[in-house]
Amino acid sequence: RRQRQMCIRDSSVWAAGVVFYNVWGGPVLVWLYVAAMACAFALRRKRPVLWRASWGVPALLLAYYLCIPATNDKEWQPSWSRLPSVEINGNEIVVKDVRSFIYRTERDFDARYVTRRFDLDKLATLDFAVSHWDGMEFVAHTMLSFGFEDGKHLALSVETRLPERGEQGSVPGLYKQFNVIYILADEEDLFALRTNYRKEDMYLYRINIDRENLKKAFLGFAEKINSLHERPRYYHTVTANCTTELVDTFKNYLGVRRWQWTPVFNGMCDQNAYDRGELLHLPGESFRELKKRSFLGHGGNGEDWPALRRRWEEGWRTFASAPVKE
């Protein structure tokens, strides 16, 4: 009986969020919903039929929630205004709408989207970025960067696609308030925005992956990126976020189960990846030592992004000709 009451309570609280975020006039109607559910609970002994009938309200709201379709037909904020696309012609990769913004401050920038070309056969490395903000240790934003033999990089970040007048938030992210977007960008945009302008604490690691699986992973991400043009999806704080989307692609396209990074409280996902052998490191190097060496700073030393990248690369020359560890 107690479990049933807890289930009713929790589902009612969740359903209140559906009313607040997804129903016209929600900020007002949610109070009517809460009052009605409270009255039904208070009268549960005198009016048990009314109380039992109220159980169906969260179920109806769940059905309504599940039927809300995602759409690309909205006005989007400039940073998320364009969906990238990836064309594969033999070994040639053509990436359209690569974000390459020029920043003066975090909010003052020139919006610029470009087309980039890469050689699939020259795809050589995959770097994993973990960026913390506001001193939060257990929460982070995770990103990837594909590296090519000719020195080119293509950065990837899974984010909330914010509509005009929309605001970031973990709770709205539970209620279909944002689309999910895969941003493909120059590192000078995606990474430098966080290190040099937002002053976040960012760490960059090299993933332990061979070239064959790296190519499979890239093609898998390309397929997911292209699919969003015809089949947009909602971002979800728990099930479809910056980390779960990366993990799902590694699982689905590489056919391995070792990619098990913590999806929500993902600030420790680099530690988890190290423990599972997913990060390259020097022989005998502890995670603490690796993390210290992988810290990119937060722009306080005045380095621009190319200088940060060059400094970081110096620490990985040891692995230039070394085989991937099992």
Residue ranges of model-derived segments:
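Glycine-rich catalytic cores of cysteine/serine-nucleophile enzymes that process amide/ester linkages
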Residues: 93, 104-202
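Short, small-residue-biased leader/transition segments that mark boundaries at the very start
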Residues: 1-8
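Juxtamembrane "helix-exit" motif on the non-cytosolic side of transmembrane helices
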Residues: 15-24
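Cytosolic-side transmembrane helix boundary signature
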Residues: 31-55
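A cross-kingdom marker for long, charged
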Residues: 267-326
